């Protein structure tokens, strides 16, 4: 077996796995801010983020999609735009000034980045 530490292109997530991870990401974005007792506007922002991620995830071409019409290459580009928006949310005063909200935002951003970076976008098994 090839040594995984020497493989600079190690991408263990298939598009199907990425799709499932996106659903979990959306659930976390929709629920965790409420559990953290975040500001009502912050909760609403993350509910909108969650809805968007769920929507384009459910429409992307992977095994667990509800209606697979969006190619995964386009999905990747939407992910990158979405993650840019989440990064910018760190500067929003109601998030920046609340340690729990800021920590959640940075964790969500980190998880999203890892999910995108570890996905084998060229895997056409779906």
Regions found by a protein language model. Name each.
Residues 1-126:
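Short amphipathic, positively biased membrane-proximal segments
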């Amino acid at each position: 077996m090839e040594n995984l530490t020497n493989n600079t292109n190690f991408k263990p997530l298939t598009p199907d796995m990425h799709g499932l991870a996106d659903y979990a990401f959306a659930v976390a974005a929709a629920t965790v801010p409420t559990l953290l007792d975040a500001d009502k506007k912050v909760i609403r922002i993350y509910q909108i983020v969650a809805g968007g991620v769920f929507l384009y995830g459910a429409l992307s071409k992977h095994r667990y999609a509800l209606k697979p019409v969006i190619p995964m290459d386009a999905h990747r580009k939407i992910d990158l735009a979405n993650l840019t928006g989440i990064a910018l949310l760190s500067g929003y005063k109601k998030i920046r000034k609340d340690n729990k909200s800021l920590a959640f935002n940075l964790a969500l951003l980190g998880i999203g980045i890892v999910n995108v970076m570890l996905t084998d976008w060229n895997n056409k098994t779906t």
